[in-house]
Each structure stands twice: as C-alpha cells, then as structure tokens.
Amino acid sequence: MTSLAERAAQLSPNARAALARELVRAGTTFPTDICEPVAVVGIGCRFPGNVTGPESFWQLLADGVDTIEQVPPDRWDADAFYDPDPSASGRMTTKWGGFVSDVDAFDADFFGITPREAVAMDPQHRILLEVAWEALEHAGIPPDSLSGTRTGVMMGLSSWDYTIVNIERRADIDAYLSTGTPHCAAVGRIAYLLGLRGPAVAVDTACSSSLVAIHLACQSLRLRETDVALAGGVQLTLSPFTAIALSKWSALSPTGRCNSFDANADGFVRGEGCGVVVLKRLADAVRDQDRVLAVVRGSATNSDGRSNGMTAPNALAQRDVITSALKLADVTPDSVNYVETHGTGTVLGDPIEFESLAATYGLGKGQGESPCALGSVKTNIGHLEAAAGVAGFIKAVLAVQRGHIPRNLHFTRWNPAIDASATRLFVPTESAPWPAAAGPRRAAVSSFGLSGTNAHVVVEQAPDTAVAAAGGMPYVSALNVSGKTAARVASAAAVLADWMSGPGAAAPLADVAHTLNRHRARHAKFATVIARDRAEAIAGLRALAAGQPRVGVVDCDQHAGGPGRVFVYSGQGSQWASMGQQLLANEPAFAKAVAELDPIFVDQVGFSLQQTLIDGDEVVGIDRIQPVLVGMQLALTELWRSYGVIPDAVIGHSMGEVSAAVVAGALTPEQGLRVITTRSRLMARLSGQGAMALLELDADAAEALIAGYPQVTLAVHASPRQTVIAGPPEQVDTVIAAVATQNRLARRVEVDVASHHPIIDPILPELRSALADLTPQPPSIPIISTTYESAQPVADADYWSANLRNPVRFHQAVTAAGVDHNTFIEISPHPVLTHALTDTLDPDGSHTVMSTMNRELDQTLYFHAQLAAVGVAASEHTTGRLVDLPPTPWHHQRFWVTDRSAMSELAATHPLLGAHIEMPRNGDHVWQTDVGTEVCPWLADHKVFGQPIMPAAGFAEIALAAASEALGTAADAVAPNIVINQFEVEQMLPLDGHTPLTTQLIRGGDSQIRVEIYSRTRGGEFCRHATAKVEQSPRECAHAHPEAQGPATGTTVSPADFYALLRQTGQHHGPAFAALSRIVRLADGSAETEISIPDEAPRHPGYRLHPVVLDAALQSVGAAIPDGEIAGSAEASYLPVSFETIRVYRDIGRHVRCRAHLTNLDGGTGKMGRIVLINDAGHIAAEVDGIYLRRVERRAVPLPLEQKIFDAEWTESPIAAVPAPEPAAETTRGSWLVLADATVDAPGKAQAKSMADDFVQQWRSPMRRVHTADIHDESAVLAAFAETAGDPEHPPVGVVVFVGGASSRLDDELAAARDTVWSITTVVRAVVGTWHGRSPRLWLVTGGGLSVADDEPGTPAAASLKGLVRVLAFEHPDMRTTLVDLDITQDPLTALSAELRNAGSGSRHDDVIAWRGERRFVERLSRATIDVSKGHPVVRQGASYVVTGGLGGLGLVVARWLVDRGAGRVVLGGRSDPTDEQCNVLAELQTRAEIVVVRGDVASPGVAEKLIETARQSGGQLRGVVHAAAVIEDSLVFSMSRDNLERVWAPKATGALRMHEATADCELDWWLGFSSAASLLGSPGQAAYACASAWLDALVGWRRASGLPAAVINWGPWSEVGVAQALVGSVLDTISVAEGIEALDSLLAADRIRTGVARLRADRALVAFPEIRSISYFTQVVEELDSAGDLGDWGGPDALADLDPGEARRAVTERMCARIAAVMGYTDQSTVEPAVPLDKPLTELGLDSLMAVRIRNGARADFGVEPPVALILQGASLHDLTADLMRQLGLNDPDPALNNADTIRDRARQRAAARHGAAMRRRPKPAVQGG
C-alpha cells in the first residue's frame, strides 16, 4: 500500500472524497479506492410476468412464478416459424419465451420526444428511459436534481432487432434512424435528457453486458469519475431471426424452459426485460441519508481467451474472475451463502460453470461451514441476454436485503455431469430464510457472455443506515403531486390514492409527504393535498384526480404566480366565536405569537387575548372586537412569517391600517394596541348611531344617487363597481330601495356605528389628544394607505383621526399595489375583502387573491392549503423517511413502424394495386389492397375539408398501373403505348385507417378495355369510385417541348402562400403532397411549376406516374388562376374529377417541371385545363389533356361512418366529499324554489312528493330560504318564483323540480312526460321573464328513471327530460339546467345535497347525472364504435316491413332501401293521400315489390294495428318496423305553446307507443325508431322535438331491457329529404342519401341500441355554440374542436381597454361580424358588413329567433355582456349591436347618438314596426308541415 493511500485511509469520508476529486483533476487516481464499497440505492425494472418494479419482482420470485409463454402474435407467428428440426430452413425449435407486454408503448411527450422520433427509436431505448427514471424515483433522487452533475450512465445492450425491422421498411427510413437504433444513443439520450455530465457508455458483451456495465459503473465511482451512476441493461425480442440462428446451434430449449443444473437441461429459453440500478459510493450514500438496499463489495471482469471455441465457456477463466472479485471485495468464499449463477440450463454450460463454482465457493463441506445456494432467475423469466446480468443482480440485492433465498424452478436432480456431493453447494427447491451467519449476508452474481466476457460481483447486506423517524407527527401533511401537465397530475394523484388504499396502507402519511416533497421531481404543474390523516389524504387525492374541489386541495391552477406579496388587513366583521382555537393547538408559531403579545394586550386593552381565544366565546362590543381582531391579525402575520412568507407591502382597510402599521414597523405592538384600544373605546360611545350599506354602484354613480340625501356620504371605495355609504338609517334604507329597483345589489352592513361619516366628528378631538404623544417610525415595509394618497403615511395622531373619518380608499390602494405585486393575502379570521380585491384587480389571471382563515372550514387545513397555494408546503420543512411510492404513471401511446407484413407485401406489389388475380375467362384482372392511412400513412396528407381523401391522381396511377400490368408491361417500366381515356372520378373515397380497395380490368365485347375501382361499404355493397378506358397505341414518345428550353418568366408565387390559399378553400396538402417548389404564373393564362417529390412521399419502382407528381401538376392548374380569382371558398373547392387522356412517355424521376394551362376560366361549376410534364433533359415525360375541375361543396365530401356516429355513454365520475360545514356554502346561500306534483295518485308521484318534502326540511337554513309550489299549477309557480326573487337579501339560487313516474303503464308515462315538459317550460318563463339578475340554476330530479346499465328499463317520462336539458343548454345556458337521477333504494337526498353544494365549482358542469348507490355516473357524448361482425341479414328476402311516415321524403328513401334489399311487401303509413310525385316513386317501387299505403295518423287509436295487420295479410312475415313519423315546429322554450308541444309530441312519441303496442305479439328481427340528433346534441328551438325524440330513445331502451328487439338512430339532417332539415345550420351538414343508407345498413347489422348519425361541423361548433365549453357532456367534442372552432386571436373584453373609442368600436364590430357570419352561415363577411353604413337590420338578412339566441350566447362568451334577444329581433343592425355592447362595456362610443340605450331600442322598434305593417298588408298564408 502506498504512503498516500495509508494516510488517506485515516481521513473522513468527505475529506477522502474531496482529495480523490483533486487527484482526478490532476490526472492521477486513488489506488486504495478500488475496493471502496458501493451502495445500491435504487432499482427500476420491467420483466416478464407484469413485473414493473422491485416489489412486484420480489413477489414473483417469492411465489416461484414461471412467466414463460408462447410467443405473442404481435411479435411473430409462433406456429409458422416453428419446426422441431434444427436444420429446418428459416425455422426455430421453440415457440416460447419470457415477454414484456406493450413494448410498442412509450410516453414520448413526457421526455419531450416527437412522435416521429419516437417511432424511429428502438423500443429498448424507450423502455430504458422510463425504467431509469423509475430507478431514480425508487432511490429518492429527483431526476431533475442531477442536471449538470457527474452522474454516469452505463448500460448493456446487444440486440439490433428494431434495426432489422426498420431496414425492412427502407423506403420510410429517415434521419432519426441514425439516433434511434445505435446502442450509444440509448445511454447518450438518457444523459442528454437528464443533463448528466458523467461518462455515458453502452456495453455490448452479449449475455454479460449489463453485469459488466455495473462493474464499470462501480469502477467509475471509485475513481471519482462519477458521483452517481445508473447501470443496467435492456433486451427486447422483436424479430425471429436471432432465435432462428440460436436454433441452429441447438442452444434453445425445445421444451421452453431453463432447467438450470438439472438433468433435464436442454437449452435456454429467451426472455426480455430491462433493469436499472442506482449506485453511489457507500460513504456518500450514508452522508446523504440515502436508503441503502445493498452494497457492492467487489467486482471483476475477464475474458475466456482461447477455449474449445469462441462461444464455448472456459471453467478456468470463470474461476479466475470469481477469485478476483472475492479478492477485491476482501471477503472469503465461505462467507457467501448464495450465488446467482449464469445458469442457462445448457448441457455444456452448466457443468462447466459448476466446476468453477465448486473450485471457489464449494470448498469446506463437513467443516461446519454453512451451505451455499445456487439459483438462476432464468428459471423464472428466461435468459434476458444483455439484461440477464442486471436481472440476477437485482434478485441478489433483494435477497440479501430481505434475508430470504427464493426457490429455483425446474430442478429435480443434478445434471449427470455434475458431482456436488463434496461441496457446500445446493440448488434450493423451496424458498427459505437466509442461513444464520456471524457477519453480514453476502451473495454473488455471475454473468458470462457469448463472446467470452465474464463478470462476477459480490453483494453484501447494507449497514444499518436507517433514518430515525421524526420526533413528532405534524398536525397536517402536505402532499405535493407534480406532473408536466394537469392531466398527468390527475393521473399521478389517482395512482397514489389507490396505492395508499392498498399496498401502501401502512406507510406513515408524514413519510409519504416527505417522499413526494423532497424525493420527487418538481414539474411545471403541481398540486397540493393538505390532510390530517390518511383517509383525508386519499379523499383529497381522489378529488384532485377527478377534478373536483375539496377543502385542502390546491389544484394546478390555484398556485400564486409572479413576484410581490401584499398582506391586506381587513376591518371589522371577520370575527367569529372559536377563531384561532385550532391554530393555538396546531401551530406553535401562532401560539407563541399570541403568548408574546398577551402581556402587552392585557396592559393596553385590559383583558387576555390568549384566554379569549382559548375560551372561544363570541367577542361582543366594538371596544373588544377591534383590539381582538388586531391581536389576531398580528399573530396570523407571525404564522405566515414562520413559513417564510413575508410581505413586500401592506394595506389596511379602516381599522386594519393599525395592524398594517405594526407589521410595517411604523408602530410597535404596544403602540398599535394603544391606537386600536383608544379608537374603539371612543367609538363605543357612539354605538347605535347611523347605518352603512354596500351598493353595487361605482363611486360616480353612488355620489350622483346620494346627492339628494345630504346626510348620506360615501364611506368606502370598495371596488370599481361597489361602494359603501353611511348616514342616518332611514335615508340609507331609502337609497338601498332605489338601488334595488335597478336589479343591483344593495344591503345593510352590520356595524355598531357608522364610521367614515360626520357622525364620528364629536370624538375626533379626543382621539387626537389621546394619541398626541405617539411617535411613529419610518416603516421598513411599504404601507399603501387607504386614508391618504400619500405614498408613505406618517402614523401619528392626525393620521389615525383621518383614518376614522375619511372615506376608505380601498380600491385605489389595491389598484396601486397591483402594478408591482401579484399576490394579495387577506390577514383576518375570515375573508371579508375577497370580492373587493378580485373585483378591483384585473381578471386576466395575473393576480392571485387569497385569505388566511375561513370560519366554516378547518382552520389548520385551510391555512395550509393557502400556504401551499403560495408555493410553500409545511411538510417540506419536516423530516421523514423515504417510502416506495408508485412511480410516475406513464401516459403511453403506441409508436411503431408501419405494419411489416403490409410493407413486405407492398415491396413485392404495386402500393396502390395490391394482390393480383387473373380471371379464368375473358382475360379480366382483379387487384385487391388496403389503401388506409395506417398502411399508406402518406395518403393522410391529402385532405379535403379536413378529411383524408384518395386523390384523383391516385386513381389515375391505379388505372395506369393496372393497364400496364395486365397488358404485359414490366412492373417497373413506363408504357408509352398505353393511353388512359375518359378517366372519371364518380365518387370521392374517404380514407380510414384501413380502406380496402378493389381494382378490376375488364375486356369488353367491343374490344374496349375498362378499369373500374371500387371500395366496399360496411353493408357489403360495392361502391364504384373511378372508371377509365384503356387504349393501346403505337404512338411514339414525344420529344423536346417547344416551351421547355429554359425556365419561364412571369409572376413568381410563393409555394407557401399558394398552399395557404388552398387551405382556405378546404384543400390541405401535408408534407407528402406539398411538392411544388417553384410557381411562376404567366400572362397567357398558364403557370410553370417545379415539382420535387418530398421525402415523406414513398418511393416505389412500380409507379408509372407518381400520385404526388400528378397531384402537384393538378395543383399547378389552380396556380394558373389569375390573382383575385380564388379557386373556391371556405365552403366549396375545385377538385379534379375527370381527364380526357393521360399519356406517360418516360420515367418521371423525383423532379420534374410542369406547364399547366387553363383552357376555360368559367367561374361556374367547373374549370378546364391541361398539363405537360417536362423532365430535366427538356423532354416531355407525360401529358394530361381535358382536365375538368368541378366545384365541390363541403357537404358533398364523404366521411367514413366512424366520423359520423355518436353515442351518449355513462361514465363514472365521483364527486368530492364535502365535510361539514361545507366549503360551497356561499354557492347555496340565497332563495330556493322547490316544485313537485301535488297530486299523489301514483306511487311514483307519491315518492317524488315525499322526497321533495324531506328535501325542503333538510335544505332550509338561516342562509337558505326555501319556497314551494305545485309544478302543474302555473299561477302558483309564477307566484312562488316572484316570492323567491323578491328577497334582495336572498336572491334566487336554484329551482329544484322533483319529477315522479305516473305508473308502470307506458301510456300513463307518455301523458305524464308531456305534461311535465310543459310544466317545466312554465318555470323557464318565470325565470326568464321576471328575473334579470344572475339566473338561478334549474335542477330536475328523478328517482331511478334513467337507464344507466343496459338491463335497467328506466322510465321514458324521466328520460324525455334529457331532450329538454339538451335544448335549454343552448337557449338559456345561464340556467345550467341539470337532470339528476337518484337511487331511491339508498339515501337519495345525501347525493342530491352533494350535487347542489358542489354546483358552483369548476368551469364546466355535468348536466345529466345518475346515482347508483354511492357511485355517481354522468353522461358524456362520445364517438361511437361499430362492430358488424354479427352479420345477421338486415332485410329478409320476401319478408314484410312497415314504415310510419312512409310517404315523407325519408320514408320513401327507407322504402326504396327495403325494396333494394329484397323485401317482398312494404307497408307505408301516411296522414294524407300520396302526391303525384310520391305516386311516381311508388309506381317504380311497385314493379319490384308489393307496396301498400295505409292512410291515417299513427298516433290515433287503431292506425298502428291496421299497419301491422296489412303487413301480415296473406301470410306475410312481418320482420321489421321503422317508425319515421315526425312533425317539427320550431319554437323557443320561452314562447312554446301547449298546442305546439302536442303537435310535435303526437307522431313521434305517441306514435312510437302505438307501434310498440301493436307489435307486441310479432316476432321481429328489428324494431327501429327514427329519432333526432336534437335529443342527443341539443338544438335551440327544437325543445318539443327533442323531448319527443328523447321519449322514443327511452322507449327503445325499455324494450331492449325487456328482451324485445329495438334500436334507435338519432339522425342529423338529411339532404333534400326529411322534416328535420330545419336543423341544418352552421354546425351540422346534411347527410346524403347514400351516407344515410350506409349507416342504416351498418347500424342494424351491428345491433346497436342507440346511435347518433350526424355530420358535425368540426370547424364551427364552438363558434356557433361557445356555451358547450362549460358543459362536461361535450368534453370530447370540445377537445376535438378547440383548434378548429377558433374565431381567431381574440383577447376578450380586456383587449379593448387600451384602445381609443374608435378602435374599440372597430374591434367590437369585427368580432360581432365574425360571430354573426358564423351563426348565419355566411362565408363572406361582406354580406353582413357592407362598406358603409352598417345599419341594415339583421332580420332582413334572414335572421330568426334561434340565430338571435346563438348571437347573444356568442356575445356573452366574447365580451362578458350580452345584447338582449328582443333587441336583435326588433330590427337591430350590426351597428346597433356594437353600440349596445360598447355601452354595457362602459366604453364611450365615438358616435354620441349611439350611446343611449333607449335610442338604440327605439330605432330597432321603428324598423320592426315598419316591417310588421308591410307583412300584414301582404298577409301570406301560414305554412303547414306534415310528417
């Protein structure tokens, strides 16, 4: 040993570490440290058997689980590759392995990796990233804390399977392959993403890779290259090729098991997985108080050298590496009781390994030595090859840590070549405790590589380094849950809650908080859960996960942001009994502050503050209240300070300025208490004099109002919109009454004496005198005065006199503070200034307003929640122990190369033709392939109005390729003798993930050859998309193009601008199709472009005319259109649909020039053109003549069925439990109206009435007034609501309607449903017509009426209310109508109470809710899925069918569909005789089936029976019924009449019931109801139709639950047919007849119960209906439409503040113009906004009441205020609406004439009157709609 080492050995660990670093910097090493112990402090792993971490791995080992399984089908076909003969070509001798699930899943977003890069990354790299992160979390080392540190990464990798997979798809290889698959990138990426500065080394020594990596990591630590090391390895089996090769060696077990050391050993079975360990020097780990799992005492590596073969093991080398490791570890072999062997289970390898083990660890048997067990984890999970070493290492670490040796599987007797009799070695066949030993437990791990590299590691039990538990448990714990997004925070909270309820139930809460706060990464988003105990913590975490508010939960959006804190001290009014009691008991800093203040308090005030708080009695009298409040405020300030929260400025409100002065240092506590005591004592003399009132008026309005009351003065400037007045009680009450008439808030403020008023004047001289000797100091913290405008007041006697007398300038002070400060904390026992603060500060979210206590909530929990919101968690200051929390939950997505089998097939065949079959007759040919976007992802870059569409160029290439292939041209050769004529796209082909395509080449009898291209519908029908004629011509190749001698000159157009223009017309060309690199527009009406095939477009030798090239050439025709003549609009686009001829002369290559000519620029329905493609040599490569571009409307673009079908599904959504007193008390304070049916003539009604009565008794409280009425008594309802709305102290908050079922008979239910709907419209009229404040929320309550599960019949009467809910969401969104279905078998009112208490929380609300037991379900609109595999025939040949509403447009479409499908008899019901047009249709159908018309109203008795009887006449087999009868009469709920409701209700709902009853004895295949999208999506003006449709929906559910066939389709509007065309608007496009028939076929075949079918306009839904953002039902739609529905960059009303009046008016006008254009369906805004003037009434543009409602709702979303619907309908113009909004926003309009609201309304009324007079003179006949 060197002298340096000897001296260094005497140093402390810290000193030795510092010396070692210096030596490393000097270029030398530290020789004694090669033996330094290394601590294992963390483990991450994923192994077969669903092992996701050390706990699950140990459980697998302890249970002796064998994880080997047959090769999963997503890897390869095990049977196809299997052959027991090792010599079989291309086959393997095994079907088995150990596999990790979901190897294609990765959380790329978490690591900031793009999807494109993630696809190119080897999954081994991906899993290594995630497991490395998990290992650091297990170690308690926040990964982000390692950035910039000397942390090393050493990982073993040897497999290249994913590289092989990528090479198979060489056409799609991109730049990311170079960093996605090399092994060096795996470690480099970890170092890069975590910012690690230590060595990053990838190790490939085959099977020993990961153990060698661990050895290198230990060496690096000892040499001080690194301070922390991540070491391990990964192996995934993605390709069969390695297994095939190993089979040729006979290395793999034919039985699929590793029988280590056993006589049955026949080879190994491959496994896969990943393991990572976190290593530190033991001294560092002890210093850092890390949890040490085990210690690496020594390790060694060597090579076999020359042996019997390169892959043959060498016993001597294995013995040497073991000996070296033991020597370096300085331990004897007999101290090792367990060896984790290489143990592959091969006939050759096992005996050789045992020989080396016997020569080292085996000696000593019979000499009292303890035995040594041999194990191999390969018997559990297979041979993990590159990860095998780390798997065994982790097993050894866990074994020594837990003192238990797991059993070895598949061992019965020793391999005959092994003699263990003379050794201490044995194979444990049962798990057993570790043998007793004098020293620490020790184990060893061996790993031997195929190429000869060996590694051996000695592992030892960790020394006792446990951190002592904290001395005392905190009263509360703060759990910080962090994530990169709010969604990740929610999922982390859910996982943690589940863990704390299950595996982690025994973990102390303080340790959980400590681990979260100190040992986890802090991401951009974090939330905090404050809890006293485990149950509270779990409930808080679940609330956080569900997005529900709860006491003690601070979500991601509640944390204060920005610099600058202001402590705000309130005036009188925040006191309450028992304030501060919990804080005295729980918070030492608060108790200390009170105790230190108490002697001063007693001396100045005369009684004990401390005793007052302990007693908890109510403090009475102004002379006691004010001093106690100041004492409380000073103690609360010290509480904040004890956690490091210090104010940067202070503000006091009235008496609160005393506390502010003390905190700022201007007064001492003694002086402050003297001031408040003197002040309050003098005020007590005036007790009972004067009154004060809070007014919802700004200062100017308040001054103007009280000008007539000389004794009333302005006392407080509370906020920009609120003031407080003071004066004689009678005058104050008069002012209150005057304000109340304006529907504004006005109420008394409870005070002993009216301060800040002349009433105070008599005591002011004495106050000045008593405080004359006060000597204030300059404040150390800025005071922002509410008494004077001076920046820093002098807190002398004059100041305190003015403080009591002057008006409180609170909002001015807050406004001034808000310039430089972001967080305002109210210091008081209860928040009383919150509203004033939030009302004053800007609402853009840059300021945070908080409080300190809340009298209705747990004081300690509430304070710590506020503390967390500031960014401080109390438990961050406490100690604790690291616990094994669940790791970060990954948000996995699938990343994988394109399907390999498809790629292999495409490599051999044309990409768009596919498999070829030559027909036996006529020389016809057929090709079949899949052109879906999953198989051909590049085609997804060709979109029309957002939908991937097969380009016409693609069809043209298919025709060319088919003709060339069938006519004998080589697959990769151009065929100049082939001409395509009369090419036509008959119907666009929408592309889905998988889109099968069939191409047919037909030789006609006239020697003509045709190509036809088909897809197949879900109903099995072929749909022809394109046709072409093929001609074989001897035409010679064209040569040089006369105009192609050089680039043309003209007007250059930017390709980016050109593509942007195309996007405006609905054409989107993604990277694969954006091929134009140069565009020059020429004067002769042509354009020359340069085309380069993008890298994203695939290459293939089979292309004759690459679709991307031809598509770009067709784009060039559009580029030839002159400036100003846009080829299309937002609602229509010009698309190529036919070509006269296509000729290809020579190979195009990747680059070509194009000359495009416009031959006809007619702006009508189409344009004509031709193109010439010129190669680089100047030769013509191809020509296309007679190109026709047709104008295609947006609604004509087909969509796949999956994009048109919707469902309303139930989702469990728990509500956060609310402790009493509830936090939502403020949201329920006010007046409530409870309505129920007073008649109890049915059990359901009696139940509802009883529930209503119980609710009234429970809900009444001092803060809630409850009124009642009979729901069916209209006058009583109106009177009750007038009474509810008449109490200004308790404004209306909610209307609760209890709805009961009529009886078990459906006909009674039908009438009850209709009557209930009508009665609820009365409630709406009462609210909308008589109340002008914030609308109360409407609650509809039923008991078990909704069908949540499929087997629940429900009651149609209750379910019909869903239609009303959906419509009111748009007509009156402010009412937030909600249907709650309670479980009457449980405690329904508890659930209802929870709903009402939580109603005010969150930005979204649930509108249809069902409780089942304690489980809460909500309805969500979702995309539906369809499975047509059931495949039963939809229409039976020759059978009979009935269609109600059969003579309507939709009925006749259904009739034709039935006849086309083979129906024998179709009975059509109708109310009138057929028209001539209908007779013509019927006559045509009659030629193919028997058509019978039955006249009558299906809602009338006997008509339905007649329809069924007719269908069954003469032995007809009735197999299906379609109920399509309908009448629509648009009407807003507010104005709907009872007759209107009945006319709509009868055919849809009553008719459905009649058809249900009439078919009771029929054996039907299906009973289909045609319902409306209005009941699924909602539609303003469609309340009656929506409710009737919802009743039909529920009847279908009732039938299914009763075992009867039934289905319903909620149709959106059809084009040209159906009475529901009124629903067409800017949100729903019409369904074509073909689309409707496809849906009808598919949905009946799939046997779905309920499905909505509609073409939802993704680009306009949020524009037309901004209110859906606040409705949780539409969450999925909102997420889909957020980007598409944007109306541009609108900053909200705040964006107008900095504009001058003229600019503000223009901004408002432009925004309203965009809104109106979207609602009314104008694509050209100039229709709405002509140049000048802007006073054309909107009603003259076609505006109706429904549009007016939507314009109002849009204005509310944009500006926060709304124009009245009546104003819009009275003839208002865009100019008028702008003026009204400017007035409401408080912006001065530059046109003074428009500032008066009466002027605006008068002008609109005059226009309306003139139009009405003209209309009466014309007297048109009323329109009648029929069904």
Swiss-Prot record:
Co-factor requirement: NADP(+); pantetheine 4'-phosphate
Region Acyltransferase: start-end pairs: 566-876
CDD domains found in the cross-reference section: KR_2_FAS_SDR_x, PKS
Domain Carrier: 1706-1785
A single BP term in Gene Ontology: phenolic phthiocerol biosynthetic process
Pfam families with a match to the protein in the record: Acyl_transf_1, KAsynt_C_assoc, ketoacyl-synt, Ketoacyl-synt_C, KR, PKS_DH_N, PP-binding, PS-DH
Sequence segments annotated as region (Beta-ketoacyl reductase): 1439-1617
One GO cellular component term noted in the UniProt record for this chain: plasma membrane
Protein name: Phenolphthiocerol/phthiocerol polyketide synthase subunit C
